[in-house]
């Protein structure tokens, strides 16, 4: 069974892209045809619009990018209908040949961590849950024993996790940059990530434990690429948050793989951007999504 890291790096090389399209549906920003389809903001109606929106994005970017990243929170806020929608979106992405990284930032210890992992990791039958994804973002705050249950499920299901190491938000440094015993917290987390990977490397030297490192901190991105040579990096903060193409190239290995760069708003709401003209009724919004994806691919190639 091909490991998660092997699958993702192969998809990067196959598509010639390191772009990860973030699926963050927001009702007020949906294209007009989808906003108009929502009945009195009923949650089941909003969920149906989210499913259609995300699935049409998937259809627009399939073959152009290696992966998509649905943000679980936007679906969870709709209750049961939203969770059904999330499952439908994940399944559609799998069927389209895209790797799915669910952004849930889960964490706990023992059996609860295993339950989270069972719910969100593994896209292959017979183990697949309704939300079974190829990878999941996780928090390291509870320590090593909170990550090990996720890694054990990754081993069984050829899945992956992305551990929050140095995040792109301005307030992340409040904890992540604290120094303890001569090392910052993010450096200690990076060491843990590398340790968890060491016995799990594929032929290219990558393990199932990836890391989230923000493009908004380019010096730390260079530092952490060296500190975690066995981890695929998930790099948020490109575009809307200010990270540049030059900044994020440092995350990639010599083959142009080893990292994926996330963009959500700049792609999925591209119909709102003046440079991508769409019809007045926004009926061709999918064209803007595709054009924005191609633009980002070209920017990252340099």
From Swiss-Prot:
* InterPro entries the UniProt entry points to: Aldolase_TIM (IPR013785), OMPdecase_AS (IPR018089), OMPdecase_type-2 (IPR011995), OMPdeCOase_dom (IPR001754), RibuloseP-bd_barrel (IPR011060)
Parts of the chain that traverse the membrane:
none
In what pathway does it function? Answer: Pyrimidine metabolism; UMP biosynthesis via de novo pathway; UMP from orotate: step 2/2
**Signal peptide as annotated in the record:** none
The annotated active site, in chain numbering, is 105 (proton donor)
* Organism domain of life: Bacteria
* Sequence similarity: Belongs to the OMP decarboxylase family. Type 2 subfamily.
Q: What is this protein called?
A: Orotidine 5'-phosphate decarboxylase
